[in-house]
Design a protein with these regions (language model features):
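Alpha-helix-loop-beta-strand connector modules within alpha/beta enzyme cores
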Residues: 98-115, 162-176
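Hydrophobic faces of well-ordered beta-strands that scaffold small-molecule active sites
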Residues: 49-55, 85-87, 116-120, 144-146, ...
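Active-site loop-to-helix "anion-binding N-cap" substructures in soluble metabolic enzymes
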Residues: 87-113, 122-127, 134-135, 141, ...
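Histidine-rich, glycine-flanked metal-binding segment
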Residues: 5-49
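Residue-level signal for inorganic ion chemistry
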Residues: 4, 22, 77, 81, ...
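Metal-associated gating/positioning segment near the N- to mid-region
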Residues: 41-111, 128
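Histidine/acidic residue-rich metal-binding segments in metalloenzymes
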Residues: 131-148, 152-240
Length: 240
């Protein structure tokens, strides 16, 4: 690739880029090599491939399925310069982690056009789930997601505490979807009773201060567990 502006960890500079196979092997001005193909990228910016670490492909949720499967989603990713996606393997409540991971691998294998990996959601906490975790790490799964909302997924404060402690012991990292499920459910019931069912009612049942409460509660639970935690997809400054 000749004449582009290359973005690296050291900044942006005009340079040529030589790629062999899937690897960058040389970066500089006036590279001379017996390359098979030269592409003039003058006026273009060359980035390393981006990583989207939070996708939901072919996910059945709320009576529907997310818009993209692994084929269409990975093609769209590549068009935007994303060369790796990390999706969420989502076992159903009562399903083993291994079974859920197997189903997600079946969704992806032979259909995905970019590199991919998996996080694992945990929607139940019991001895069986805890006992499966070492095998998940052996399978390459070291990042997990927990929910503080949605009836089929939420963990209570006690289970959040135990899950965070166990994942820290194993060397994993955990992301948490923070909402106050109880109050939201109450507000939703009030809106339904009043017949206020338009899209405008949705944010009214999820005010910023409730997300902030859930974030604060999670941080205290993580403090008690002495565990690191990631808070996923914040929506407002108060929660931040």
């Amino acid at each position: 690739f000749k004449g582009g502006s290359v973005v690296s960890g050291k900044g942006v500079r005009r340079a040529d880029l030589l790629v062999e196979g899937e690897k960058v092997v040389s970066l500089g001005r006036g590279i001379k090599a017996e390359e098979d193909r030269t592409i003039d990228v003058s006026g273009c910016v060359l980035f390393p491939g981006f990583i989207d670490a939070h996708t939901h492909f072919d996910l059945e949720v709320a009576g529907t399925v997310t818009a993209d499967d692994f084929a269409s989603g990975s093609r769209a990713a590549l068009r935007g310069g994303t060369t790796t996606v990390i999706d969420f393997a989502c076992p159903n409540k009562g399903e083993s982690l291994a079974s859920g991971l197997g189903r997600w691998r079946e969704k992806a294998v032979g259909k995905t056009f970019c590199d991919y990996g998996f996080h694992m959601t945990i929607d139940d906490w019991n001895e069986g789930v805890r006992a499966e975790l070492p095998e998940m790490f052996a399978q390459g799964i070291s990042s997990f997601k927990l929910y503080m909302t949605y009836p089929a997924m939420l963990l209570g404060d006690r289970d959040l505490y135990w899950a965070l402690k166990e994942l820290k012991t194993l060397g994993g990292i955990c992301g948490v979807h923070c909402e106050n499920a109880g109050v939201i459910n109450g507000m939703v019931a009030e809106k339904k009773a009043a017949g206020e069912l338009s899209p405008a009612s949705h944010p009214q049942t999820r005010p910023p201060y409730l997300e902030a409460e859930a974030v604060g509660r999670l941080l205290r639970i993580a403090q008690a567990a002495q565990a690191p935690v990631i808070i996923v997809h914040l929506t407002n400054g108060e929660a931040l």
